[in-house]
């Protein structure tokens, strides 16, 4: 059977495509009931602006929906890099788009909010997997049980239904030699819905917090497996087939903070073959559940060489999905490609051009290509918060390491800048 590329799959009904990154909407979430959390309005503004990444997956004949219009300098920067930009519609809400029913919406995530909009505009099409199937797949506990039933290797862990079983699980994991544990609730992606526990004091604090706020306990406590590689696979699932689109490595610092994605992970031939086999096997189970479209699976290869193929499934597009066309293009010319996320606070009021000039100055003598593909900024009373995404393409690992160092130096400089 002929492979239908995802971009063609999304165009099968022949209507105008409207890309929509509703990244702030959840399919389901219970994390806030269990774990202490603080709302940060600046961070929420930053998250919305990550919709700029839609520009790289959309085709010129498509339309993208933005809540916030990117700076013209950012759009000109990409025109100079020969990116054919789609049409852009900028509104506060998707419902404000004129003649909405003439579009086929391709969202970041299918949600109750989006389905409610569909009820209001019945002729508007949405290409997305079934929400009930997504919820079943995103449920961390159901996914773990499904993998166990089908012979997949899973982390050492225990389901906990009360405070006593949670205490017992922690004691068991510490006795088994784990120095850290991960406490999970059923739902929550991108680090939401889990807490890393690195000592008993933190465990006792969390235990008391949960005990004071919950009557029903539904948790999973897992031992922390030291990672050699934190892998993510992108799958495209149709009615009849499962396709592996990409295998990437998440770059995580010692504090567990996400720093970027390595698009050329260091897997041996046998490791890559084993990983592919297990991921496609997991994908087939997901296909049988009725899922259709793109999704991401998080995996780990630990320091003992043990592969745990399914840690978490995100039944939606991922941010890696959006820049895959850009990555594929760079991999034709460069051996090493990775994205870097740069986050800093500064009193300086920087625009895209300011930062791009500083970036060019710092990396001028380095024989690598650096693309600034997302510029997010949120202004506050005393500081401005910035989050930038860059794609670094290099011919060898030495160049890549040097580029990382220069980017970190620039981050430090920007933090202390006044401008």
Swiss-Prot record:
Q: Does the keyword ATP-binding apply?
A: yes
Q: Name one GO molecular function term.
A: acid-thiol ligase activity
PROSITE patterns per record: ATP_GRASP
What keywords tag this UniProt record? Antibiotic biosynthesis, ATP-binding, Ligase, Magnesium, Manganese, Metal-binding, Nucleotide-binding
Ranges for domain ATP-grasp: 144-345
Has UniProt tagged this entry with the keyword Membrane? no
Q: Which cofactor does it need?
A: Mg(2+); Mn(2+)
SUPFAM superfamilies on file: Glutathione synthetase ATP-binding domain-like
According to its UniProt entry, the protein's GO biological process terms are: antibiotic biosynthetic process
Q: So where does Mg(2+) 1 get bound?
A: 298, 312
Q: What is the UniProt remark on how the cofactor binds and its stoichiometry?
A: Binds 2 magnesium or manganese ions per subunit.
Which Pfam families is this protein grouped with?
ATP-grasp_3
Q: Which reaction does it catalyse?
A: holo-[BtrI ACP] + L-glutamate + ATP = gamma-L-glutamyl-[BtrI ACP] + ADP + phosphate; 4-aminobutanoyl-[BtrI ACP] + L-glutamate + ATP = 4-(gamma-L-glutamylamino)butanoyl-[BtrI ACP] + ADP + phosphate + H(+)
User: Transmembrane residues, as ranges?
Assistant: none
Which residues hold ATP? Answer: 174-231
To which pathway does this protein belong? Antibiotic biosynthesis; butirosin biosynthesis
Q: At which positions is Mn(2+) 1 bound?
A: 298, 312
Question: EC number(s) per UniProt?
Answer: 6.2.1.39
Residues annotated to bind Mg(2+) 2: 312, 314
Give binding positions for Mn(2+) 2: 312, 314
Subunit notes for this chain? Monomer.
What the protein does? Answer: ATP-dependent ligase that catalyzes 2 steps in the biosynthesis of the side chain of the aminoglycoside antibiotics in the biosynthetic pathway of butirosin. Mediates the addition of one molecule of L-glutamate to a dedicated acyl-carrier protein. Following decarboxylation of the product by BtrK, adds a second L-glutamate molecule.
- What is this protein's name? [Butirosin acyl-carrier protein]--L-glutamate ligase
Gene from which the chain derives: btrJ
């Amino acid at each position: 059977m002929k492979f239908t590329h995802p971009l063609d799959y999304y165009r099968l009904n022949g209507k105008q495509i409207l890309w929509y990154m509703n990244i702030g909407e959840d399919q389901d979430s219970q994390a806030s009931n269990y774990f202490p959390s603080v709302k940060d309005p600046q961070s929420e503004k930053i998250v919305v602006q990550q919709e700029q990444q839609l520009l790289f997956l959309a085709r010129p004949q498509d339309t993208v929906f933005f809540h916030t219009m990117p700076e013209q300098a950012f759009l000109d920067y990409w025109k100079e890099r020969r990116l054919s930009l789609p049409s852009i519609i900028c509104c506060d809400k998707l419902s404000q788009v004129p003649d909405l029913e003439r579009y086929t919406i391709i969202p970041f995530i299918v949600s109750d909010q989006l389905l409610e909009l569909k009820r209001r505009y019945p002729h508007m099409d949405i290409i997305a997997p079934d929400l009930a199937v997504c919820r079943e797949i995103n449920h961390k506990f159901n996914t773990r049980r499904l993998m166990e039933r089908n012979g997949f290797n899973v982390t050492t862990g225990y389901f906990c239904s009360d405070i006593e079983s949670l205490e017992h699980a922690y004691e068991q994991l510490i006795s088994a030699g784990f120095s850290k544990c991960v406490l999970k609730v059923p739902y929550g992606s991108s680090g939401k819905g889990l807490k890393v526990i690195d000592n008993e004091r933190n465990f006792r604090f969390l235990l008391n917090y949960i005990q004071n706020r919950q009557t029903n306990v539904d948790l999973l406590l897992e031992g922390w497996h030291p990672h050699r590689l934190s892998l993510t696979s992108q799958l495209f699932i149709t009615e009849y087939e499962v396709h592996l689109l990409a295998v990437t490595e998440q770059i995580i610092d010692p504090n567990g903070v996400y720093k970027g994605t390595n698009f050329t992970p260091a897997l041996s031939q046998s490791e890559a073959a084993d990983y592919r086999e297990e991921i496609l096997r997991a994908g087939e189970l997901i296909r049988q559940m009725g899922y259709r479209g793109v999704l991401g699976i998080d995996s780990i290869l630990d320091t003992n060489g043990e592969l745990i193929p399914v840690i978490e499934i995100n039944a939606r597009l991922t941010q890696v999905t959006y820049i895959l066309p850009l990555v594929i293009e760079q991999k034709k010319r460069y051996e090493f490609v990775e994205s870097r996320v740069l986050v800093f606070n500064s009193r300086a009021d920087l625009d895209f051009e300011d930062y791009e000039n500083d970036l060019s100055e710092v990396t001028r003598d380095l024989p690598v290509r650096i693309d600034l593909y997302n510029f997010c900024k949120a202004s506050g009373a005393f500081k401005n918060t910035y989050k930038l995404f860059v794609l670094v393409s290099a011919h060898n690992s030495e160049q890549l390491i040097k580029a990382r160092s220069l980017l970190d130096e620039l981050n430090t400089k920007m933090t202390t800048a006044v401008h």
